[in-house]
Amino acid sequence: MEPVASNIQVLLQAAEFLERREREAEHGYASLCPHHSPGTVCRRRKPPLQAPGALNSGRSVHNELEKRRRAQLKRCLEQLRQQMPLGVDCTRYTTLSLLRRARVHIQKLEEQEQQARRLKEKLRSKQQSLQQQLEQLQGLPGARERERLRADSLDSSGLSSERSDSDQEDLEVDVESLVFGTETELLQSFSAGREHSYSHSTCAWL
């Protein structure tokens, strides 16, 4: 923004100089030298005598340079007019008013840029602080220990559930074997009792 502001300042000075020259040409008087102290009168120096051809040549060169400078200044002002947020009556603006509005607009843009930079730095510091807090929380031994205990508890609960299922299956197998074994023993004892009674009855008949 600084080079643009310096260019605007140069354009302001050039516009003021041109307007002053135009007013002087209209009224037909010359202005005082601006750099002398008050009370001193600017004295005109007599130009040295030159040949008429050289005088005309120098004047034509000066006019050509002045024409180029005015054309360049006009192009710059037109580009500035296109970039400025002007209103509806932008055609009424003079060169000086346009340059003043451009300077005010540049100052506003610089203020907005500074505010954006401050906000960016604030957000960056906040992000760094949150990142540090996250790293501290991840690096705490208590957090790691809690995570390890949680994993161990999940593993132990899985093993206990598997053991309970296997114990239940063993218990069912034992109960079935006990039931089947009892029935077999009862059948064997019953058949043995019947054979014993048959033997006693046979002996009695004999």
UniProtKB/Swiss-Prot annotation:
Keyword Repressor part of the UniProt annotation: yes
Region ranges (Interaction with SIN3A and SIN3B): 8-25
One Gene Ontology term of the molecular function aspect: DNA binding
Low complexity composition bias: residue spans: 126-138
Location in the cell: Nucleus
Residues in bHLH domain copies: 57-109
Lineage: superkingdom: Eukaryota
Pfam families, A to Z: HLH
GO CC terms of this entry: RNA polymerase II transcription regulator complex
Subunit relationships: Efficient DNA binding requires dimerization with another bHLH protein. Binds DNA as a heterodimer with MAX. Interacts with SIN3A AND SIN3B. Interacts with RNF17.
Purpose: Transcriptional repressor. Binds with MAX to form a sequence-specific DNA-binding protein complex which recognizes the core sequence 5'-CAC[GA]TG-3'. Antagonizes MYC transcriptional activity by competing for MAX and suppresses MYC dependent cell transformation.
Extra remark: Mice deficient for Mxd3 show increased sensitivity of neuronal and lymphoid cells to gamma-radiation induced apoptosis.
Listed name of the protein: Max dimerization protein 3
Gene label: Mxd3
